[in-house]
């Protein structure tokens, strides 16, 4: 019997890669919830694609369909504005509650690593001082992990996401600004600072999601939380890789410290939100994470240079 998977956010950057991966690597039937099908660059004339015209705001209309699904992948989110809580918390809660626990094998929810500490525990600061988006993702996860479907739930927490090309796949938020950043490399090369992070390309996210859907992930203690990203790299490593790629030599560098940033803020009367100040103090966004290799896969974009070569 053909397996059925319900996908939200299929027209976004990560969504495009997931749809493409599932079409190429499984024989499943995909049900895509799309507000604007014209944004989907994948050939949706395939007999394995069913387009459902709508969005999370009217998810109740699709309750009977969702109850029949073997799998669910929810990548859709509201990034800010008056509907942030409605979409990211209430409607996602409704979506996952419509799944039949006797039918659904696995449900994947996309959150953000920004709400976690390095041990994958929820950070109270995300709820207390986070942006509307951050706070809503924090609240949603708490609710989803208390639903009956929690035993089948895998929450993935992408780190810094690259991907897209502006043609058959839309850019991620980070990749959309990459060309602009590269213009400033002649100046950035003179700077250094303490900090570290993970990154991952949307292609590799899609690899991981497909693997998780097909094979599952047993950590012995559901629901599962997985931070996905390549091994950590320092900010200074990133600067060095970008400079090497663009052939800008590094001679000497100015140390950018929190004290220096605060001085610049004071001199120019720059305002910074409480959440941004918290992130500035954190500096190291490093987690207990998994890579494609941890699941027996091979990352297509293991290094920053691989990503830059696609720009």
Model segments located where?
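Conserved Rossmann-fold NAD(P)-dependent oxidoreductase catalytic core, especially the SDR/UDP-sugar
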Residues: 93-136, 154
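Terminal hydrophobic/aromatic helix or amphipathic segment near a protein terminus
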Residues: 239-287
């Amino acid at each position: 019997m053909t397996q059925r998977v319900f996908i939200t956010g299929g027209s976004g950057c990560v969504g495009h890669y997931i749809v493409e991966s599932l079409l190429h690597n499984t024989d499943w039937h995909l049900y895509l919830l799309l507000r604007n099908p014209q944004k989907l660059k994948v050939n949706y004339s395939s007999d394995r694609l069913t387009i459902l015209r709508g969005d999370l705001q009217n998810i109740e209309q699709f309750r009977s369909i969702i109850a029949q699904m073997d799998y669910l992948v929810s990548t859709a989110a509201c990034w800010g504005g008056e509907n942030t809580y409605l979409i990211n918390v209430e409607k996602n809660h409704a979506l996952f509650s419509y799944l039949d626990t006797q039918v659904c094998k696995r449900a994947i929810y996309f959150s953000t690593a920004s709400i976690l500490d390095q041990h994958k525990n929820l950070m109270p600061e995300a709820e207390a001082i986070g942006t509307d988006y951050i706070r809503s993702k924090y609240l949603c996860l708490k609710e989803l992990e208390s639903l009956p479907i929690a035993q089948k739930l895998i929450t993935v927490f992408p780190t810094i996401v690259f991907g897209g090309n502006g043609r058959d796949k839309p850019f991620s938020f980070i990749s959309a600004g990459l060309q602009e950043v590269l213009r400033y490399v002649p100046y950035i090369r003179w700077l250094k600072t303490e900090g570290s992070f993970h990154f991952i390309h949307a292609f590799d996210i899609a690899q991981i999601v497909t693997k998780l859907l097909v094979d599952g992930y047993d950590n012995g203690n559901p629901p599962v939380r997985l931070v996905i990203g390549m091994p950590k790299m320092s900010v200074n490593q990133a600067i060095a890789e970008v400079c090497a790629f663009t052939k800008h030599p590094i001679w000497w560098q100015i140390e950018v410290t929190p004290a220096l940033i605060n001085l610049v803020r004071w001199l120019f009367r720059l305002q910074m939100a409480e959440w941004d100040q918290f992130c500035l103090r954190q500096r190291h966004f490093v987690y207990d994470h998994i890579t494609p290799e941890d699941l027996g896969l091979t990352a297509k974009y293991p290094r920053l240079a691989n990503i830059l070569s696609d720009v």
